[in-house]
């Protein structure tokens, strides 16, 4: 690592810490030549391979922009979108792959988006999965209803509190 002050090609790591929820390493370095300290942030590269075969760095902002269109007019905040993009990136990085197809990124988006807003999920899925008919929408809605029923069945019933009666 070159020193940004004197351009010496060597430096010594003084301190290392995790940053950005573990997706990066922040290192404090010291130059043996001039003695000045500087900070570096190291992240692993994650490339998205587009349909054309061209690779580009993964971008949370592209995820947010794509999902924002599906969330238009819905009660979804910018913070919600940022959290969704972070969750998508974490899931992709957890796979351990340095490269991922753009199609796979879309599949990863569907899960967190479904939890965030079902209408936005349907909008995104309709474009992403190229819905061509009402039957496609009906099948997706039926799947959402089925999953909601399964979730409700898995949750334990909460005991009702006895009502107070006045004497």
From Swiss-Prot:
Pfam families: ATP-cone, Zn_ribbon_NrdR
Coiled coil stretches, renumbered: none
Top-level taxonomic group: Bacteria
Disulfide bonds listed in the record: none
Keyword Zinc-finger: yes
Keyword NAD belongs to the record: no
Stored InterPro entries: ATP-cone_dom (IPR005144), NrdR-like_N (IPR055173), RNR_NrdR-like (IPR003796)
Listed PROSITE patterns: ATP_CONE
Domain ATP-cone: 46-136
Textual note on the cofactor: Binds 1 zinc ion.
Keyword tags: ATP-binding, DNA-binding, Metal-binding, Nucleotide-binding, Repressor, Transcription, Transcription regulation, Zinc, Zinc-finger
BP GO annotations: negative regulation of DNA-templated transcription
Residue spans, zinc finger unnamed: 3-34
Chain spans, region Disordered: 148-167
Function: Negatively regulates transcription of bacterial ribonucleotide reductase nrd genes and operons by binding to NrdR-boxes.
Family named by the database record: Belongs to the NrdR family.
Protein name: Transcriptional repressor NrdR
Naturally occurring in which organism (per UniProt): Pseudarthrobacter chlorophenolicus (strain ATCC 700700 / DSM 12829 / CIP 107037 / JCM 12360 / KCTC 9906 / NCIMB 13794 / A6)
């Amino acid at each position: 690592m070159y020193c940004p002050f004197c351009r010496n090609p060597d430096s010594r790591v003084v301190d290392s810490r995790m940053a950005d929820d573990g997706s990066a390493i922040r290192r404090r370095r010291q130059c043996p030549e001039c003695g000045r300290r500087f900070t570096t942030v190291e992240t692993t590269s994650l490339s998205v391979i587009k349909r054309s075969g061209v690779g580009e760095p993964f971008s949370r902002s592209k995820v947010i922009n794509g999902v924002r269109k599906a969330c238009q007019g819905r009660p979804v905040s910018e913070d919600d979108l940022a959290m969704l993009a972070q969750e998508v990136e974490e899931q992709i990085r957890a796979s351990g792959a340095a490269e991922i197809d753009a199609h796979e990124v879309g599949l990863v988006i569907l899960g967190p988006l479904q939890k965030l807003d079902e209408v936005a999920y349907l909008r995104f899925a309709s474009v992403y999965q190229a819905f061509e008919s009402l039957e496609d929408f009906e099948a997706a809605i039926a799947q959402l209803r089925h999953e909601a029923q399964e979730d409700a069945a898995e949750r334990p019933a909460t005991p009702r509190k006895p009502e107070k009666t006045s004497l």
